[in-house]
Amino acid sequence: MTRRCMPARPGFPSSPAPGSSPPRCHLRPGSTAHAAAGKRTESPGDRKQSIIDFFKPASKQDRHMLDSPQKSNIKYGGSRLSITGTEQFERKLSSPKESKPKRVPPEKSPIIEAFMKGVKEHHEDHGIHESRRPCLSLASKYLAKGTNIYVPSSYHLPKEMKSLKKKHRSPERRKSLFIHENNEKNDRDRGKTNADSKKQTTVAEADIFNNSSRSLSSRSSLSRHHPEESPLGAKFQLSLASYCRERELKRLRKEQMEQRINSENSFSEASSLSLKSSIERKYKPRQEQRKQNDIIPGKNNLSNVENGHLSRKRSSSDSWEPTSAGSKQNKFPEKRKRNSVDSDLKSTRESMIPKARESFLEKRPDGPHQKEKFIKHIALKTPGDVLRLEDISKEPSDETDGSSAGLAPSNSGNSGHHSTRNSDQIQVAGTKETKMQKPHLPLSQEKSAIKKASNLQKNKTASSTTKEKETKLPLLSRVPSAGSSLVPLNAKNCALPVSKKDKERSSSKECSGHSTESTKHKEHKAKTNKADSNVSSGKISGGPLRSEYGTPTKSPPAALEVVPCIPSPAAPSDKAPSEGESSGNSNAGSSALKRKLRGDFDSDEESLGYNLDSDEEEETLKSLEEIMALNFNQTPAATGKPPALSKGLRSQSSDYTGHVHPGTYTNTLERLVKEMEDTQRLDELQKQLQEDIRQGRGIKSPIRIGEEDSTDDEDGLLEEHKEFLKKFSVTIDAIPDHHPGEEIFNFLNSGKIFNQYTLDLRDSGFIGQSAVEKLILKSGKTDQIFLTTQGFLTSAYHYVQCPVPVLKWLFRMMSVHTDCIVSVQILSTLMEITIRNDTFSDSPVWPWIPSLSDVAAVFFNMGIDFRSLFPLENLQPDFNEDYLVSETQTTSRGKESEDSSYKPIFSTLPETNILNVVKFLGLCTSIHPEGYQDREIMLLILMLFKMSLEKQLKQIPLVDFQSLLINLMKNIRDWNTKVPELCLGINELSSHPHNLLWLVQLVPNWTSRGRQLRQCLSLVIISKLLDEKHEDVPNASNLQVSVLHRYLVQMKPSDLLKKMVLKKKAEQPDGIIDDSLHLELEKQAYYLTYILLHLVGEVSCSHSFSSGQRKHFVLLCGALEKHVKCDIREDARLFYRTKVKDLVARIHGKWQEIIQNCRPTQGQLHDFWVPDS
């Protein structure tokens, strides 16, 4: 028989190169020659019909039979059949209008015999024995877009394993199996009456084409691993290609709707997809039985059910269907055994679960090693405190590489041994994981699901211990995540690491197996919901599995949250779905499935809530609400009935809080009135305390004892409180750091003689000669100041002597102008003109300097009283206050009427004006040293010392004062004669010891005259403070040190206190001094000691001493330690004592330094201490 086909590649008769398209012809010429013996040859009509069908488009009948689980012993070739549609296979169910074909024994069908003949010839041509054909798993590969797919054929357990499993069935399962067998026998009897040989041939032929296409797709992914296999006829490739093109168009139309529904209601998607898998599981065993018995009468009923819900399935979930292929007789093709629906479901379940486990376990015959294997392709994410596992999207190369690894014949036997245990364990793991997976569920459903999971866990601990080693966590769903990483997780901890070797084997068998398992639980719940109480627990585990494994991910990628699970043996409740699988007949199961589908499609969440609440007979643990209610002394029994598990936490908590008895509150009118009175009393007390704090009467301090208001403040204190405050009060302000100062300036008298508005250059009697002078004289008062500050006067008198009236006007304006900037600018102009006038060497006239009267008039106009300017009676100037006023009035006589009522020009201390006057005086005393007489210099020195006592000048560095004092002391002609007079005059400027110390420290000590004045002034002040007679101050330093030793002995604090007490008693009429006055006198005594010690330091440390004075300093050190240091008794409450003792230590250190720097006397190497005589 001649066959027309394309020539095969040399060297590779049947297998194309990897990556190439499958050849048009799948059988070589003469390929059947080796297998012709005992085989029936094909007729030319059959071959012609096959060629015609090759170029025809695939019919609907071909498409809906692609997933048919028909048995086939043919090995197909081909390579990488790409599916670019929805990445899956979906059945197109047959129309319910088709008549049921008559069942005919398969061995009598001519088409099947011709097809089987060609296949056997094809296998014998390549020398591959049928027994060595790999057993393909019952699973489908869920692929990413654009990847390849293979649809492996099915396998079933050996007869021995099946009989072994039947031995362990419970009585309930045997009973259900018996009912199923009876129902199936009735279906077969009804099917015989509707037989039609012509329709039977059509249906059988369509089944063969569908099964061939599925097997072809499965073998195409295995072509790279089995290059010796030859391809089959191109008819089945064309059918599969046309199916894929149609699925591509359908996917594009449904993609947007599926993504929106998937993102909005993932729970509904999961539920609907589980229902879809349930329909497939219900349909596939019946297809197997129809293949064995040719026709099953109940086919149209199941097709009606599937067609009725097909549109709703597609709208609520992504189009992913786990496909199953093959039958139980895949390994034994010569045996055709008729089984009941329950037997087929049982065998399919037993053969599927081990293969699902084999996808994440290494294929080893040794059982113990399988426990330590792990799931792969899991990506870890931690969005919260829950571990999140996601499946990484597979690469196209990974799909085909993992196909051959999971198809070894030995896997069937190894996996079948653990089928029942693995099924239950996967249900338990899926139940716990799914309840943590759905974050969109209501809070009540999440809590109920968690409680049910704990109940299942408790029930598992009571079952057999043979299954307690491992609870394998199945791979849940593939999530395309490019950035995910592989995470190893042990099965016992729900940790599922993978080796890199098994990276390509992930989701094909697991997704299909667990989805089908979930469907079986759902069917069982629909059939035996009211009969068996254990079914509800199976419902609980099956429902989450449906939503967990049946949720496909496109966009956004679905994620799985996994909580650590504890391995425990499977509970009997987990076996309930499998044990009750055979109960009921097929018609009753079909009607129950319809009702269940309708109920689930109406409301998925209500269905889940009903499933969770249906477990009433199961032993339950204490709920969280019951434990929390114990805090309120309340139990669920007290409320009448426990809250339903489906209610949320809010409703449960509100139920329990409603039974808590509130406390009794007696709010009477008397209590309200009492509270108001207490509030008013507290408000008044708070106001009183705030007022006392504001007035400084918050704490009664003994510091103010002796003051006028101290007695009033302490009248309200008890005696014991007074004693307590007096005992523990701390006095820290007895010795201030700064001198108290005096009020020298009276700002109300400022501007009494003149101000910036009355000073006019035109009233000075000046007659202008130059153009600039005439311009200034023609200008007003404001313009005169402007021209002066802009440099007109400086340029006018650059080469000419400046007239005295102009200089005097500038000096007065500088001292009285309220704008400090203008005052500084006038000072600059005045100093520049004065310096320029001094450069004229040919001029016989000295530059102008202000006279003592001009200086006194300026300070008097600032607000200083005339008696303060010249405080000493024996040192008075030649003028008086009236002269200053009259002189100024003559210069401003014309404007006196206009400014008869003057106002103070200064409200604060004019420190800028004061310093400007002092600076100009310093310049004048430097340029013209002989400008002042000695008497005038002494009056100026006393004036400066008095002005420095101003309180507001304490914080201002008086460097300009010291500079002027140096010039004035330098200009004194008879210095030695004037020093004692100057010291006695300064000593009279103040009566306060600290002010006098300030005057001593104001004297500059960096000149010889300054140090001398400082020493003499210190001795004079010390003698005054110690009430000694004023003696002539010796000029020699040796005599001064000797006098100092005599004064130092009298500086004992106790002696000073006695003198003060005696003086105070003399002033008191009764001569009695209380303790408070004694404390004040003690403070004054230590304060005086502090000042005296500073003055002693100024006397001794002002300049360097010779070796002849060394013995005097040795005496001073001994007197200081003996009379002062030893007399001070420090106290923590009396800080002033510590302050005085610290000063004693510093002075002693300085004297020791002077002693060390002085050389010993002539002829002595060492100094020895000589006791006082």
Curated annotation (Swiss-Prot):
Task: Give residue numbers for sequence motif APIM motif.
Answer: 137-149
* Annotated GO CC locations: chromatin; chromosome, telomeric region; intracellular membrane-bounded organelle; nucleoplasm; nucleus; PML body; site of double-strand break; Smc5-Smc6 complex
Found, by tissue, as follows:
Widely expressed. Expressed at higher level in skeletal muscle and at slightly lower level in brain, liver and heart, than in lung, kidney, spleen and thymus.
Where is the sequence biased in composition, kind Polar residues? 317-330, 409-428
Q: Which gene encodes it?
A: SLF2
The protein's name is SMC5-SMC6 complex localization factor protein 2
Q: Which family does it belong to?
A: Belongs to the FAM178 family.
Q: Which domain of life is it from?
A: Eukaryota
Region NSE6-like domain, as annotated, extends over: 664-1166
Stated role: Plays a role in the DNA damage response (DDR) pathway by regulating postreplication repair of UV-damaged DNA and genomic stability maintenance. The SLF1-SLF2 complex acts to link RAD18 with the SMC5-SMC6 complex at replication-coupled interstrand cross-links (ICL) and DNA double-strand breaks (DSBs) sites on chromatin during DNA repair in response to stalled replication forks. Promotes the recruitment of the SMC5-SMC6 complex to DNA lesions. Plays a role in SMC5-SMC6 complex recruitment for viral restriction.
